[in-house]
From Swiss-Prot:
Example of a GO MF term: tetraacyldisaccharide 4'-kinase activity
Kinase listed as a keyword: yes
Organism for this UniProt entry: Chlorobaculum parvum (strain DSM 263 / NCIMB 8327) (Chlorobium vibrioforme subsp. thiosulfatophilum)
Residues annotated as binding ATP: T49, T50, G51, G52, T53, G54, K55, T56
Pfam families (UniProt xref): LpxK
Known function: Transfers the gamma-phosphate of ATP to the 4'-position of a tetraacyldisaccharide 1-phosphate intermediate (termed DS-1-P) to form tetraacyldisaccharide 1,4'-bis-phosphate (lipid IVA).
The protein's name: Tetraacyldisaccharide 4'-kinase
InterPro entries: LpxK, P-loop_NTPase
Keyword Nucleotide-binding annotated: yes
Amino acid sequence: MSSRSASFLLRPAAALYGVVMSLRNHLYDRGAFKSWRSPIPVVSVGNITTGGTGKTPLVDWIVKFYEASGIPTAIVSRGYGRQTKGVQLVSDGKRILLGSRDAGDETAMLASRNPGTIVVVAEERVEGVQFLMREFADRLPGVIVLDDAFQHRKIARDLDIVVVNAGTPQELDAMLPAGRLREPLPGLSRADLIILSKITDDAKAAPLLQKLRETGKPVLRSKIKPGKLVKVDGSENGATEPAVKALAFAGIGAPEGFLHSLEKAGITVKATKFFRDHEPYTEAAIRSIIEESKRQEFVPVTTEKDWFRIADNPQLTEMLAQAGCRYLTIAPEFLDGTEELEKRLLSVLETKVVNWPLSPP
């Protein structure tokens, strides 16, 4: 069965899901469902589709902006793909306490990239925020960044940022499970700011850009900038290596973006192996990657997020280190609106912190 046929058959379920999400949003908008408001300013970064929008690099950029501005910051994330449940402290801002298996690959990467930041995972973000306020009452953060929380309306936010992938406009055509929309497009009316990410061609992105601007919300444009190609054995941490002939492997939501970043870095991709988003790597999968790389004399290259998923397993780590594996770092690069984003990020700091403890929501 073709993917188009499968999508058509799933349309009734998608329509029902859309009705449920619309009703849920309506009840929140009318006040029938309540959102708890944190006394610490909250910035939410989320998306309206599943996976692959560039949300995590943006969270990293925002945290670094606040820290550079002298504002202590905390991250609260769901920790997608983790094997733990409930509230877990990933980093206390002094040391990293959990790896990707217990924190989720994206959260583990954010904690590693921001060693001075408190990082908590919790399915219920309210519980995560209240936990960090209890546990860190002597050094409360000045702002909390929620990772992937646009649909998590149990907690109010002072700034709601939505990231949309410019490379896959067709994802906005159908609800889950027929498509990748998490909620109907009118939900974008809740956003304070929309970022059209991963732009590789201005002309191709123009129709989606116009569609997003019709929401009346400010729309910023960004692309992904490739960074360093890092050897996983730690022997080198420098610039990219254009001479590398790569076997690219990844388990992410939009692997075509990874391939584009490798191309922009001047790396020649000779072969690919892709897995499902957040899928755990097995010894057999890694062995297959290494064997093909050796046979073809290619270098195995993956994403930084994938590497954090692998790094919890010493055996797989050693296998890839001996094979000369690298991972590519990335960062968002704004094509316009940087000052607008920074202005809005600073404006939320006008919210005052009140005394803890608070009444439960």
